[in-house]
Amino acid sequence: DVVGYGGSPVECVDLLRENGIPCLKGNHDAMVAHGNQVAGRMKLMWDWTEQQLSFEQRSWLAELPMTFELPEFQAVHAMLPMPEEWGYVLTASHAAMHFAYQTNPLCFIGHTHSPAFWIEGEDREHEITSIEPVFLDRKQLINVGSVGQPRDGDGRACYVIYRLDQQDVWWRRVDYDIQAAQHAIEDACLPLAFAERLSRGK
């Protein structure tokens, strides 16, 4: 998700647009760009976010692709085969359903906000070390975690680097100014729960 959680949606959209960074559509991007019918604090956040963005910025979100594929890997925000239904890969059975439609040996996903590593044929989530080899003879599913809204108990930003020359995936955690992100949410008078969870990584 580019937007829909924090107090700096304009800056996030502009950073990606101005630098030509390829990006997939997340469920929060879709709700902001296409409208939503939810209630509660998520509606407050999404409605506020929509009001901050220009027509061009919302159009950019609306036009983001659902999937991305290169010869070396494919990527999708949620679960295959229907990413627009925003299914979560949380268990080995979820991963098995996803693998049935994964066309590349390696696929990157997000959506759960927690780093994870699934290997086809294994009945449980693969334990992550900081660097994992990529085996092109069997399918692997890699959740990249979250930069701005981690949910695995570690508040630091999480992302991965796929090193083609080494054929491995490197999970990285980096510190960022969590208080500044919290203040942006508070200054916008958005629900405090969005700010409080940043320091907990939950």
Identify what each model region corresponds to:
Residues D1-A62:
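Core catalytic region of metal-dependent phosphoesterases/phosphodiesterases
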Residues G121-K202:
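Acidic, His/Gly-rich catalytic cores of divalent-metal-dependent hydrolytic chemistry
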